[in-house]
Amino acid sequence: MRAVIAAGGTAGHINPALAIAQEIVKNEPQSKIIFIGREDGMEKRLVDQAGFELYPIEIHGFSRSFKPKEIIFNIKSVYCALKGSIIAGKLYREFKPDIVIGCGGYVSGPVVRKAAKMGIKTAIHEQNSFPGVTTKLLSKCADIIFAPNEDAAKLIGKPQKTYICGNPVREALFTANRESLRREWGISDKLCVVSFGGSLGARAINRICAQLMRSELDSGIRFHHIHATGQYGTELFSQLMGEMHIDKSNPDIEVYEYIKNMPECLAVADLVISRSGA
């Protein structure tokens, strides 16, 4: 199989797309898969890390404001969408995919629409209970729609071509060995907490987890806390740690913008704190 997969914006779109790609390759090892996304987006890092090729296009969302600055931004977004459609068409003519799959993010819009216009089979996967604007627009032209649950399927409103499949999960999340990893990381006798608020970050979770770290330190219990601040939470969390006199060099407190080895972290955790979402 030759497949093109479009996903971008947040890990909630990208990781399910990677799970789909990995399952395709697992079932058909000779398959060739190319991702489409932004060169400067999170998809570039995650797709490269997973060992797949990313074909870059520039794409932006649209603002719903009518302020002059936002109107100019929307004009630029239209231009990028048209340009992205042309670039996608060039890729399709060269690569000749059997199917194009959109997994969310603004990048999916022009990529899937162009494939449909060229007569290429298309599918879209929605990860959230409340389908996004891109999914609703693409539901008209996609051949197959995959939804996470009944509620999402009803909101999409295309029952004749919608299949409920849940959210694809990477196989690595089921294969990590808890006990060996805890020994390797030196935390066999410690309470391990893993916390994160999504790839962009969640202000409330960052505040609560900083308070929790302070409580863990004051309690005297043996603990190890791994926290991801998200893209927009790095400065805030650093500030919170300073305000609460949390030593950033403490080996039992690990703080990252994004947890790259999530399967291993989830395997060793005694408690996971996260936001809802894809």
Question: What residues fall within each predicted segment?
Answer:
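Short glycine-/small-residue-rich Rossmann-like dinucleotide-binding loops
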Residues: G104-G105, G198, G230, S276-G277
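Donor-nucleotide binding loops and adjacent catalytic segments primarily
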Residues: L46, R178-R183, I187-L271
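Conserved nucleotide-sugar phosphate-binding/catalytic loop shared by glycosyltransferases and other
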Residues: A3-T10, Q30-C80, C165, Q231-G233
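Short amphipathic alpha-helix
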Residues: H13-V25
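Hydrophobic acceptor-binding patch used for acceptor engagement in glycosyltransferases
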Residues: V100, L271-V272
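Glycosyltransferases and closely related glycan-assembly transferases
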Residues: I87-V100, V107-A123, K136, K140-C141
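Active-site-proximal region of nucleotide-activated glycan assembly enzymes
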Residues: R2, I34, M42, E53, ...
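Glycine-rich phosphate-binding loop signature in dinucleotide/nucleotide-binding domains
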Residues: E28-P29, K90-D98, W185-S188, V268
